[in-house]
Amino acid sequence: MQDSSYKEQVTQAFDQSSSTYDRLGVEFFTPMGRPLVEISEPVTGERVLDIGCGRGACLFPAAEKVGPQGRVHGIDIAPGMIEEARKEAAERGLRNIALDVMDAETPELPARSFDLVMGSYSVIFLPDAVGALARYAGILDHGGRIAFTSPVFRAGTFPFLPPEFTPLIPQALLEHLPEQWRPEALVRRFNSWLERAEDLLRTLERCGYTSVAVTDEPVRMTALSSEAWVDWSHTQGMRLLWQNLPQAQRTELRARLVEGLDKLSDATGALAIDVPVRFVTARVAH
């Protein structure tokens, strides 16, 4: 699959899900965004770029940190995400936020115009993520920082999902995925620089960074019910699996997921699952 086709699929998936993204009774991206902002330590007056900002899981906490003297620029390739983030920014009365539809792989932004670049589960979706990281170094000012999150890739588990989900998704169903989204393709793309901390360290150093820190921490994902989680899964990256499945397989997968997740739920039917997340920070070398 060409990069242009891949990006079109990503854009369409997130654009179509923007109105319900990170909603529907499931908490994950927002609880992951807050600690990413905390470890990146934005301070009053700083200029922050949020790549793949979505509906603002990092954007709004960062805007609070930098205050009215600073600014936060959110970019996303999906117009619907930018529209939803603009609505919320207006509702919050925030004037230190700018939002633009932009390809985060090749951001059209001035050199040395930011103090901090952050991305929550967004860098990993870029076809040339390593090249993008090098370009971000160029738009960071002296002493600027980068902070991003990614899944913790482990052998034998379904990428992007907690290990508990691996036995719930039959391998045969994955054949319906676009080639670049099948687990083996994801492993080839990411494991070369993301799986091991030492590979990630070397990659970031080659891209122009220093003081690299890699920390794996669980982020608690909560859902009101198994059904709520399955509905929510249509609003994030897993949407690409759902929309490529024939109806019969869609029905089968939903039933398998609900049944399996019900076994993990508490007495009220609610779910709480710890998701392994990798937090990465670094400083630009120039």
From Swiss-Prot:
Keyword S-adenosyl-L-methionine: yes
Main function: Involved in the biosynthesis of aklavinone which is an important precursor common to the formation of the clinically significant anthracyclines such as carminomycin, daunorubicin (daunomycin), rhodomycin, aclacinomycin T (aklavin) and aclacinomycin A (aclarubicin). These compounds are aromatic polyketide antibiotics that exhibit high cytotoxicity and are widely applied in the chemotherapy of a variety of cancers. Catalyzes the methyl esterification of aklanonic acid to yield aklanonic acid methyl ester.
Pathway listed: Antibiotic biosynthesis; daunorubicin biosynthesis; Antibiotic biosynthesis; carminomycin biosynthesis; Antibiotic biosynthesis; rhodomycin biosynthesis; Antibiotic biosynthesis; aclacinomycin biosynthesis
GO MF terms, alphabetically ordered: methyltransferase activity
Example of a GO biological process term: methylation
Taxonomic lineage from the root: Bacteria, Bacillati, Actinomycetota, Actinomycetes, Kitasatosporales
Reaction equation(s) it catalyzes: aklanonate + S-adenosyl-L-methionine = methyl aklanonate + S-adenosyl-L-homocysteine
Record gene name: dnrC
Subunit structure: Homodimer.
Keywords: Antibiotic biosynthesis, Methyltransferase, S-adenosyl-L-methionine, Transferase
Record's protein name: Aklanonic acid methyltransferase DnrC
Family of the protein in this entry: Belongs to the methyltransferase superfamily. DnrC family.
InterPro entries: Methyltranfer_dom (IPR025714), SAM-dependent_MTases_sf (IPR029063)
Superkingdom of the organism of origin: Bacteria
A Pfam family matched in the record: Methyltransf_31
UniProt-listed Enzyme Commission number(s): 2.1.1.288
